[in-house]
Amino acid sequence: MRQLAELLTDLLGPVPTMFLWVIVSFAFFRALQFIVRWYLFGKWTWPNFNFFDIRNRIRRRRRGGQEAENTENPPENEAEAGEQVEQEPEPDSRDLSAIPPNKKWRISNECVSLFHSVISGLWAAYALLYYKQLVQDLVNYRCDVAINLVLMSAGYLFHDLVDLLVNEQSARIIELLFHHVVVLSAFAVTMFFNRFLGVVVFGLLMELNSIFLHSRSLLNLYGVDKKSPSFRIIALLNMVTLFAFRLCVSAYLVYFVVVSIPDLEWYVSIINGLVIASLASTNTVLTYRLLAADGLLGSRRTRRTPAATAETQVGDVESGPLRTQVEDEDHHTIGVQTIHGTTEDATQTV
């Protein structure tokens, strides 16, 4: 493998070779995504889910119904008219994460994400354990093992960006897209400026927690009872690894940014600070959501497991409620039933 990499570098140059490995990784994860879909559900694709279209149709129908009602029974005053409009709450796409309309796609996407988490998390741990200089010199030390890890993960992130944008448009994925863009920016800095490889590999240690995070999401998507032993074990391991590999790593990287300010150019320090602060903030939000979802912040903030209904059983539908091309009225019904029928489990938004 190393000889092949050296041969390609000699033939193409270092930068084209890096792009080639990212493309190979992207193609691998795209192919794996379709293989998982076919293996689990016997289908390659499902209808695209666009929450914003559904919400707009709900609003148009609501306005139309309100106008018709006002024509038949006009309100006596403006206050009464305002109360009529506010009776039905505004839909929120985050609520749809508890019973995803595109449930089969979500399951296949989580499976591929879980596979990447296992590979990249263990790879990052191996690199840090066996290449001590990565830990001792986070800025300048470079090695092929860590570089190849970054290129592989970049290909996966590009794949996941495409998969999210093609299959779902909702507020739920905005956080994921933000996370992916931040991480890809960190990858670009370390690959094109030949610095901070150790910082990036430390960040990829967070994937060790993602193993249990994606496992937890899969259990939620399959409607596993949160009181079952399997769910409790995964939830416990998720919280332990969250503290060890997300919060502790984030704290260490923030410390590194602060102490390295005198040794780095001002603009480099700003870039480092923005990237690491963004990751630290997303990890903080994730921690809060997990604590709330597991009931550790009180019963009022506890999130329920997705309800097991006939419409959302994985084995019975093609793609959740949006299994076929439906009329506008069906779109409205789907959105309202999903929004009011359950409570969000926010761990699925990560």
UniProtKB/Swiss-Prot annotation:
Phenotype upon changing residue 214 to P: In et51; suppresses the glucose intolerance defects of paqr-2 (tm3410) mutants
Region (Disordered): 65-100
Tissue specificity note: Ubiquitously expressed.
Acidic residues bias locations: 75-90
Database matches in InterPro entries: TLC-dom, TLCD
One cellular-component annotation, GO: plasma membrane
Compartments in which it is found: Cell membrane
Transmembrane annotation, as ranges: 9-29, 111-131, 145-165, 173-193, 195-215, 229-249, 270-292
GO biological process: membrane assembly; phospholipid homeostasis; plasma membrane organization; regulation of membrane lipid distribution
Domain TLC, residue spans: 102-279
Primary localization class, coarse: membrane
Record keywords: Cell membrane, Membrane, Transmembrane, Transmembrane helix
Role of this protein: Regulates the composition and fluidity of the plasma membrane. Inhibits the incorporation of membrane-fluidizing phospholipids containing omega-3 long-chain polyunsaturated fatty acids (LCPUFA) and thereby promotes membrane rigidity. Does not appear to have any effect on LCPUFA synthesis.
Protein name as it appears in the record: TLC domain-containing protein fld-1
Species in which this protein is naturally found: Caenorhabditis elegans
Organismal lineage: Eukaryota, Metazoa, Ecdysozoa, Nematoda, Chromadorea
